[in-house]
């Protein structure tokens, strides 16, 4: 029961990231628009006092503000899409459900426009509907309900005379019905829930605010490995606390109150549950990255320098910390625990200094500048000395403990690797056994790089055995296991499914072959070759790819390209080794024996081929510059996590790889040398 609930929480936490990702754009517009209307910036740049400039500034502030004013519907749409694998029908259902819920609650409670205008009543005008104020939580509830309706009814069959309403068209209909029913209990119980939340938050802060902010920072950081931190901080940011803004509306949540106080140009009281991130993300973690680099083995420092520099800059500028945190989380849990304690203490220290800083996305310099320095409404400069002290503490602690306990942080790993003597034909049987057997498999899937398995009991999974069988990495998220077997992952998954269905009973019947391994051995003794850019765009370091399978080089080394166009051409003369069924990735082999994976975008496997047109098939011979794939780039931008495209050499095996060009490239430019 708990494991299933935990898995659902992880999915909800991930779904919350879609609407949260909108907030930085809203914050940028609001912060700049507000700053341009402020005396501080106008005294430095008198020309911005011009009427035209001020009108633009007001429009910018209004454009950003309207997003914060409508967070409830944004969260409803975002959560629905996130929990329904990106299908737009779920968003339509969420919108239908949102307006039905609010209209029904408003009519049931007899809410008039006059009542909604009085914030003290707990009512509000939501999209012009006088109704009960349920805030972001109401949006999340509707989004989750819409996703449930979609997943339950998207493929429903109806009698032929009702066939038009079958399938996905049935989802909004059911959502309207469910929302109408939900409105009555919501109208009855929500006022008590909101009152309880307010009483809890006020009591928490009144009893011991310092302890509250410390525990918030400490617990939030500890939840990051489980992906539950987004759920934990949501009540603090969007529901706890209250503030009556200049328009007479009651605003709930630390983040929303902070933004409203910026807009109202009043003294700040919010930010207690956000500001502690700045010293850690801008100073502490970059210093930890320096310690990890300096304690790496000499022969590995060049590689580690790139990883740590990228992670440190990401943390400093944007406040995205996972690339750094996951570099030491699993190999040195003690460091992560100390990191969590220091994070909580940072919240406490800034509270004791009576600072009030906030952000729209995370505690990086961009938010610090836009919502701290520009508004200039609190003593933001105190973050700098606190941060410098934090940098020293992080560096000293990390360096000392890494050396003292010989933690295998990046660059300090043992080089000895246990090789697998298992025949390729036996691999699906061995992997199934390592996963705990057929009875332990709840759901089996794969993409071109990894085997994705949801298990019933994670304790029955032998992670070390999976690595010994050839997995370059094993990721564990709740009861979901991801074993990185590279391009043969789909073959392994296919054969495992056939074994579980009783269709394969012996190794001789499997489809996984040793051909690739034999060729790899031959190639390792041969020369190298050149890889030419298959896509026009910007070449970036592979460590910048926001997917650990690629950024940590579990599949191999290479580059990534941020594409400007959707045309993919052959990067060398060779042969097509694999075209994934969902068309988002293609495996090639050059005449020099270089095996290359081109993986267009991230999580594009979920698009099921939409937006992709493959122009070749497996075993086709190809020549340099030959078109391989046409991609609808606009569709991918709208529906995928990212368009960044990893281009990975999957069979280096002792050879070296050199990146020949960074920055802007056109098709046919030399980008990789294997030697």
UniProtKB/Swiss-Prot annotation:
By which gene is this protein encoded? ptsG
Starting at the broadest rank, the lineage of the source organism is:
Bacteria, Bacillati, Bacillota, Bacilli, Bacillales
Question: Residue ranges of the PTS EIIA type-1 domain?
Answer: 547-651
Q: What does the record give as EC number?
A: 2.7.1.199
Instruction: Tell me the protein's name.
Output: PTS system glucose-specific EIICBA component
Induction details: Up-regulated by the antiterminator protein GlcT.
Q: Which organism is it from?
A: Staphylococcus carnosus (strain TM300)
Q: Keyword Kinase, does the record have it?
A: yes
Gene Ontology biological-process annotations: D-glucose transmembrane transport; phosphoenolpyruvate-dependent sugar phosphotransferase system
Domain notes per entry: The EIIC domain forms the PTS system translocation channel and contains the specific substrate-binding site.
Alphabetically list the UniProt keywords.
Answer: Cell membrane, Kinase, Membrane, Phosphotransferase system, Sugar transport, Transferase, Transmembrane, Transmembrane helix, Transport
Active site annotated at which positions?
447 (phosphocysteine intermediate), 599 (tele-phosphohistidine intermediate)
- Record comment: activity regulation: Inhibited by 2-deoxyglucose and methyl beta-D-glucoside, but not by methyl alpha-D-glucoside, p-nitrophenyl alpha-D-glucoside, o-nitrophenyl beta-D-glucoside and salicin.
Instruction: Please name the PROSITE patterns in this protein's record.
Output: PTS_EIIA_TYPE_1, PTS_EIIA_TYPE_1_HIS, PTS_EIIB_TYPE_1, PTS_EIIB_TYPE_1_CYS, PTS_EIIC_TYPE_1
* Residue ranges occupied by any PTS EIIB type-1 domain in the UniProt entry: 425-506
Where does the record place the PTS EIIC type-1 domain?
3-414
Record GO cellular component, one term? plasma membrane
């Amino acid at each position: 029961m708990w494991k299933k609930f935990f898995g659902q929480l992880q999915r909800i936490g991930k779904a919350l990231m879609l609407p949260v990702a909108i907030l930085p754009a809203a914050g940028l517009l609001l912060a700049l628009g507000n700053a341009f209307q402020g005396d501080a910036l106008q005294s430095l740049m008198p020309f911005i006092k011009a009427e035209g400039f001020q009108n633009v500034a007001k429009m910018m502030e209004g454009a950003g503000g309207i997003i914060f004013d409508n967070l409830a519907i944004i969260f409803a749409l975002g959560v629905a899409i996130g929990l329904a694998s990106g299908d737009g029908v779920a968003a339509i259902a969420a919108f239908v459900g949102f307006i039905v819920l609010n209209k029904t609650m408003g009519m049931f409670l007899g809410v008039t426009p006059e009542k909604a205008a009085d914030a003290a009543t707990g009512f509000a005008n939501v999209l012009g509907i006088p109704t009960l104020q349920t805030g972001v939580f109401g949006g999340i509830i509707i989004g989750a309900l819409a996703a449930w309706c979609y997943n339950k009814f998207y493929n429903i069959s109806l009698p032929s005379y009702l066939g038009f309403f079958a399938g996905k068209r049935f989802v909004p209909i059911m959502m309207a019905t469910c929302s109408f029913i939900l409105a009555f209990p919501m109208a009855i119980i929500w006022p008590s829930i909101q009152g309880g939340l307010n009483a809890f938050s006020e009591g928490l802060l009144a009893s011991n605010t310092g302890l509250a902010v410390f525990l918030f920072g400490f617990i939030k950081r500890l939840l990051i490995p489980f992906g539950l931190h987004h759920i934990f901080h949501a009540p603090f940011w969007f529901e706890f606390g209250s503030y009556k803004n200049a328009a007479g509306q009651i605003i709930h949540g630390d983040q929303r109150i902070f933004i409203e106080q910026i807009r109202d140009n009043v003294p700040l009281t919010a930010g207690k549950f956000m500001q502690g991130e700045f010293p850690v993300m801008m100073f502490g973690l970059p210093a930890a990255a320096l310690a990890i680099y300096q304690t790496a083995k000499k022969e590995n420092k060049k590689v580690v320098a790139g990883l740590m520099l990228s992670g440190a800059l990401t943390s400093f500028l944007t406040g995205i910390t996972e690339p750094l945190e996951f570099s030491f989380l699993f190999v040195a849990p003690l460091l992560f625990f100390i990191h969590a304690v220091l994070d909580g203490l940072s919240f406490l220290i800034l509270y004791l200094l009576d600072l009030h800083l906030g952000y729209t996305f995370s505690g990086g310099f961009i938010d610090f500048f836009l919502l701290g320095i520009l508004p200039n409404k609190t003593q933001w400069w105190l973050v700098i000395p606190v941060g410098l002290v934090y940098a020293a503490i992080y560096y000293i602690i990390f360096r000392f403990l890494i050396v003292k306990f010989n933690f295998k942080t990046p660059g300090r790993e043992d080089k000895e690797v246990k090789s697998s003597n298992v025949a390729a034909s036996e691999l699906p049987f061995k992997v199934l056994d390592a996963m705990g057997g057929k009875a332990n498999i709840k759901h089996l899937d794969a993409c071109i790089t990894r085997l994705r398995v949801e298990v019933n009991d994670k304790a029955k999974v032998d992670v070390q055995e999976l690595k010994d069988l050839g997995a370059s990495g094993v990721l564990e998220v709740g009861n979901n296991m991801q074993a990185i077997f590279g391009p043969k992952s789909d073959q392994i998954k296919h054969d495992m499914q056939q074994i579980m269905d009783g269709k394969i009973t012996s190794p001789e019947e499997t489809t996984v072959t040793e051909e690739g391994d034999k060729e790899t051995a031959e190639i390792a003794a041969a020369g190298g070759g050149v890889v030419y850019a298959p896509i026009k765009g910007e070449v970036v370091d592979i460590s910048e790819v926001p997917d650990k399978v690629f950024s940590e080089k579990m599949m191999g080394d290479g580059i990534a390209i941020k594409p400007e166009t959707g045309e993919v051409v052959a990067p060398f003369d060779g042969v097509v080794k694999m075209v994934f069924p969902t068309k988002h990735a293609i495996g090639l082999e050059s005449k020099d024996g270089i095996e290359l994976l081109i993986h267009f975008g991230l999580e594009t496997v979920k698009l099921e081929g939409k937006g992709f047109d493959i122009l070749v098939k497996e075993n086709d011979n190809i020549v340099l510059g030959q078109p391989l794939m046409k991609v609808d780039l606009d569709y991918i931008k709208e529906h995928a996590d990212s368009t960044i495209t990893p281009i990975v050499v999957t069979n280096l095996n002792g050879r070296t790889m050199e990146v020949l060009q960074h920055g802007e490239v056109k098709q046919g430019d030399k980008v990789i040398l294997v030697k």
